[in-house]
Swiss-Prot record:
It comes from the Bacteria. The keyword Manganese applies. The gene is dxr. It catalyses: 2-C-methyl-D-erythritol 4-phosphate + NADP(+) = 1-deoxy-D-xylulose 5-phosphate + NADPH + H(+). GO terms for molecular function: 1-deoxy-D-xylulose-5-phosphate reductoisomerase activity; manganese ion binding; NADPH binding. One of its GO terms (biological process) is isopentenyl diphosphate biosynthetic process, methylerythritol 4-phosphate pathway involved in terpenoid biosynthetic process. 1-deoxy-D-xylulose 5-phosphate binds at K126, S152, E153, S182, H205, S218, N223, K224, E227. This is 1-deoxy-D-xylulose 5-phosphate reductoisomerase. Keywords: Isoprene biosynthesis, Manganese, Metal-binding, NADP, Oxidoreductase. It comes from Methylobacillus flagellatus (strain ATCC 51484 / DSM 6875 / VKM B-1610 / KT). It holds the Pfam family DXP_redisom_C.
Length: 394
């Protein structure tokens, strides 16, 4: 019987965190919840702690940690707070597996800590690779960590690629990576209709249940753009070897085309518990509570090219990848500000790519040298984005 694995979940109250706990609960003799973290959702984390009894609970916000401490009186769970505490539970000697699912740039440092500590990292935080792909992959190698992508698309690619990490796609006989995208809720919308999109409409994804930020990113196709950058770092794939294919049914999660003409695809119902279970159990397969795929019910599979004129965020992401250096970090920071502004009704849906492009144009692109440099670039890009938003509001 496999050894009991201690699991730290960074971002436990989000969609990925909750799905991870669901999978873990199906295998009580195999996994134990070691640490749970959240930003500020006290009630939600308290409920999870009462249910799963972790050794540690971490709130990024110190005030929230004090409230959590009160709610967990009498429980053996130790409550910590702050970024240093997130890094501590990510790198703790007794933690075997780290689910890195904090949304946004806040997840970067804890993921780096887990990498240097040699953990099995289930990576669901896009920004770690988008902002600091070069540095993070170096940390994974130096720390001897095991990296398993949890994004459904990258997990699919991982499953149909050769088992050893390649220094170049050609070494595995690979011609290109085909990254599938649902196309989001506005795939068939006109320019005029996109101008009038509301946050409520954008949050209604046709296939996936996700958090608000990633749902908006899916609607703008920025989510796919960020995944292109991730795929570059995960699989040593240059931009011209990654093609985005719109596939509205979200049944094929991605494909790899080989030089002999073969195309290998990973298929399944759109449920994040599948890639999570794959990451937890790898190289074994675990039951995840996911229904079997009914091909007769699916009926048909459609494919089309993405329209970067209506959805320029995808083009901006490819451009940032080709520019390299700090460009992806600038793209990411500007996008986070833009999405937040849209959700709060401060800018329109089509203002999101306008804001991002304005910030990319305004800032100098530098070679990446350190995490501290990237954090400074992130802050500067956010400042530029906020300034643009305020000027547009005048």
């Amino acid at each position: 019987m496999p050894m009991l694995q201690n699991v730290t979940i960074l971002g436990a109250t989000g969609t990925i965190g909750l799905n991870t706990l669901d999978v873990i609960s199906r295998h009580p003799g195999r996994y134990r919840v070691f640490a749970l973290t959240a930003n500020s959702r006290v009630d939600e984390l308290a409920e999870l702690c009462l249910q799963h009894r972790p050794r540690y609970a971490v709130m990024l916000d110190s005030g929230a940690a004090e409230k959590l401490q009160q709610k967990l009186k009498g429980l053996e769970t130790q409550v910590l707070s702050g970024l240093a505490a997130l890094e501590e539970v990510a790198a703790h000697p007794e933690a075997h597996v780290v689910m890195a699912a904090i949304v946004g740039a806040a997840g970067l440092k804890p993921a780096m800590a887990a990498a240097y500590a040699g953990k099995r990292i289930l990576l669901a935080n896009k920004e770690t690779l988008v902002m600091a792909g070069k540095l993070f992959m170096q940390a994974v190698e130096e720390g001897g960590a095991t990296l398993l992508p949890i994004d459904s698309e990258h997990n699919a690619i991982f499953q149909v690629m050769p088992p050893a990490r390649l220094s170049a796609l050609a070494d595995g006989g690979i011609r290109r990576i085909l990254l599938t995208a649902s196309g989001g809720p506005f795939r068939k919308s006109s320019f005029a209709e996109l101008m009038a999109v509301t946050p409520a409409q954008a949050l209604n994804h046709p296939n996936w249940v996700m958090g608000p930020k990633i749902t908006i990113d899916s609607a703008t196709l920025m989510n796919k753009g960020l995944e292109v950058i991730e795929a570059h770092w995960l699989f040593n794939a240059p931009a011209d070897k990654i093609e985005v294919v719109v596939h509205p049914q979200s049944v094929i999660h991605s494909m790899v085309e080989y030089i002999d003409g073969s195309v290998l695809a990973q298929m399944g119902n759109p449920d994040m518990r599948t890639p999570i279970a794959y990451g937890l159990g790898y190289p074994e397969r675990l039951k995840a509570g996911v229904n079997a795929l009914d091909l007769f019910k699916v009926g048909r599979l459609d494919f089309e090219a993405p329209d970067t004129a209506r959805f320029p965020c995808l083009r901006l992401a490819f451009d940032a990848l080709r520019h390299g250096g700090t460009a992806p970090a600038i793209l990411n920071a500007a996008n986070e500000v833009a999405v937040d502004a849209f959700l709060n009704g401060n800018i329109g849906f089509q203002d999101i790519p306008r804001l991002i492009e304005a910030v990319l144009t305004a800032m100098d692109i530098e070679a990446v040298t350190s995490i501290s440099q990237l954090i400074e670039v992130d802050a500067l890009a956010r400042a530029h984005a906020l300034e643009w938003r305020q000027l547009e509001a005048c």
